[in-house]
Design a protein with these regions (language model features):
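Glycine/tyrosine- and acidic-biased, solvent-exposed loop/turn segments at the edges of beta-strands
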Residues: 17-155
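Bacterial Sec-dependent N-terminal signal peptides
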Residues: 1-24
Length: 155
């Protein structure tokens, strides 16, 4: 999961930040305003066509609250949630046709709760469960028609 956070930070640096205020991302992944103060507020980045690319909430330079990613078409791609820079809450991903393809839950930076994966047609393919980053409960796998094909119990 650290890799996802680093990827997001790298992505924002490479993409060239464009927002309502000049925001700079330092080598630690903290966001600063043009006066080099830790930034609090909403950060928005846009595609060259003017559509939003990403919108996130920051508190004292750290991602805190909702993060929304968009496809270049302007359609929503993913909603994430952070608490003090750590993954926390429900993350939902949609494909370009607007079909929900994933729902995941985190708590204090770790996988926690129910996870669901759907195919591009909206058919449930996987149901998984985590507690504090560990696999728990009954995991299920479904075929392309939605028929249960496998179950694995994790203690």
């Amino acid at each position: 999961m650290k890799a996802r956070i680093l990827f997001l930070a790298f992505f924002l640096i490479v993409a060239g930040a464009v927002s309502s205020a000049q925001v700079i991302i330092d080598e630690k992944g903290l966001y600063h305003n043009e006066d080099n103060e830790l930034y609090t507020g909403t950060y928005i980045e846009f595609y060259p066509n003017g559509n939003k690319r990403i919108e996130l909430s920051l508190n004292k330079g750290i991602i805190h609250g909702p993060v929304t990613l968009y496809f270049e078409s302007g359609e929503r791609n993913e909603i994430r949630s952070y608490s003090n820079g750590k993954m926390d809450g429900t993350w939902i991903t949609w494909n370009q046709e607007g079909v929900k393809v994933a729902e995941a839950n985190y708590k204090n930076g770790k996988k926690h709760g129910d996870w669901f994966i759907w195919d591009d047609n909206g058919t449930l393919r996987f149901e998984m469960h985590y507690t504090s980053g560990e696999k728990t409960g009954l995991w299920k796998m479904f075929d392309e028609s939605g028929k249960l094909v496998s179950e694995v119990k994790h203690d």
